[in-house]
Amino acid sequence: MLFRASQPEDKPMKMTTEEAFVKTLQMHGIQHAFGIIGSAMMPISDIFGKAGITFWDCAHEGSGGMMADGYTRATGKMSMMIAQNGPGITNFVTAVKTAYWNHTPLLLVTPQAANKTMGQGGFQEVEQMAAFKDMVCYQEEVRDPTRMAEVLNRVILNAKRYSAPAQINVPRDYFTQVIDIELPKIVDFERPSGGEEALDEAAKLLSEAKFPVILNGAGVILAGAIPATAELAERLDAPVCCGYQHNDAFPGSHPLHAGPLGYNGSKAGMELISKADVVLALGTRLNPFSTLPGYGIDYWPKDAKIIQVDVKPERIGLTKPVAVGIVGDAKKVAKTILAKLSDTAGDADREERKATIAKTKSAWAQELSSMDHEQDDPGTTWNERARGAKPDWMSPRMAWRAIQAALPKEAIISSDIGNNCAIGNAYPSFEEGRKYLAPGLFGPCGYGLPAVVGAKIGCPDTPVVGFSGDGAFGIAVNELTAIGRGEWPAVTHVVFRNYQWGAEKRNSTLWFDDNFVGTELDEQVSYAGIAKACGLKGVVARTMDELTDALDQAIKDQKAGTTTLIEAMINQELGEPFRRDAMKKPVAVAGIDPADMREQQVD
């Protein structure tokens, strides 16, 4: 079933190829572009202003792509990334793959070297379609100037349909040509609602379950399905867990909210889902990293019947055995299952289940509030030594508790990849979706700052706060030179400052006998000082009270138009390693001798 909307007049018009391009963007309401200016895109960027499109010129294209990701995730509205052919475009690779695994519909515009010189190894020439083949859900190159609008329309529609980035590749000599074309029609398809037989079986399993658990993934947020899942959970008195890095997939204040699974997530959620006899995995691909053991608990319920709901059939049953697979929109499926439940659904052990949920949540809340420090594995002493070296400094958990005391409930937050941000995974909760912008399963460093800038562009009246470790922040620090200009909105960003690549250092303590290779950062660098040099406000916080006060003031300043970077000085404690499942202690066999090193001979 399909429906049409926003159709242009069905008659040919004479226009330039760049006008056709921009008119198609207008048809789809794409109002924001992120990147760095280049000659190959100037014919279209020249008319952005007339079209109502704002071009946000960042300091590095990779950060620009992550700004686009943050904007679209926070608003639900598509944006685009665009830059100069060749090196400008290849700088987008990490951002595009990040958006792919964040299920973010984005338009990637890649101006190409001119057709007449392609294949000659010319200036800024690279095979851009090949570069992004595994990064996008759909890609197409314009083969003739008269097809400019047709191809662009199709690329945008596929980005929306598959909820992922899609690429249009345009030879630069196709711009500034006059063509006669009809603007294309927009044809949107209704999202699938699931097969009747599968829905009946899912409703039957949930109706008979003694300990049903719902697991909400990104698809719940994208489909606007949180209210529908709340109704279903309340009907069953089923606890609701959230997928890894999707803390905003269910209201934190709801009595059935069990918190996020995965790395440094909610122990309550892990303990509750381990008891499940039926799991409704709603809008999630159940990626393996998100269900790894945590806190020593191998919590995934191996004997439970799994109902997996995803709009992409190829992802159902890919990582976990399922009893029922449903290809459908999370909101539609949740509503239909609710309507199909039996009259006695949820009654089995209802009161006992409610008591277990409340008791488990309460115990975890008390434990989390008392956690001040990180633990060492047997045989290692790094965290003990780190506390002894700086006894007056905050630990990462102390910093997160100080942050929680000042963080507005309505705030949008972004998080970077890394040890200190990951330790904070259990802390933030939200009352609505599109509030938590984590880097996702591609795991890029340098995501936190650009993502929160993009979110603020899309949600100017909402407070935003970004978080990064100091290693990851170093990858995006050059954006401080861009975001202080008058047209850019004010944001607040917190950098956890412990002068180390913490996640890799924890690996070094556990498996490499404290042989720290490439883990130490320069203690002479002041990120707060760099912020000040860029015309922004830079603040250093050394205690919990200072951090709470600094964040509270920064949010007030943000409302008044001032961007603040807070350097939160913390000790060098290290949290749980990311990849305990993938690491093991190496054993020397042949041995390595420095005397075997030879000098290279240069002609």
Curated annotation (Swiss-Prot):
Keyword Transmembrane helix: no
The reaction(s) this protein catalyses: acetyl phosphate + sulfite + H(+) = sulfoacetaldehyde + phosphate
MF terms (GO), sorted A to Z: acetolactate synthase activity; flavin adenine dinucleotide binding; magnesium ion binding; sulfoacetaldehyde acetyltransferase activity; thiamine pyrophosphate binding
Pfam families recorded: TPP_enzyme_C, TPP_enzyme_M, TPP_enzyme_N
GO biological process: isoleucine biosynthetic process; L-valine biosynthetic process; taurine catabolic process
Keywords associated with the record: Acyltransferase, Magnesium, Metal-binding, Thiamine pyrophosphate, Transferase
Cofactors, names only: Mg(2+); thiamine diphosphate
Top-level taxon: Bacteria
A cellular component term, taken from the record's GO annotations: acetolactate synthase complex
Induction (record text): Induced during growth on sulfolactate or taurine.
Entry's EC annotation: 2.3.3.15
Signal peptide: none
Family (UniProt): Belongs to the TPP enzyme family.
Function field: Catalyzes the degradation of sulfoacetaldehyde into sulfite and acetyl phosphate. Involved in sulfolactate degradation.
UniProt name for this protein: Sulfoacetaldehyde acetyltransferase
Organism from which the protein derives: Roseovarius nubinhibens (strain ATCC BAA-591 / DSM 15170 / ISM)
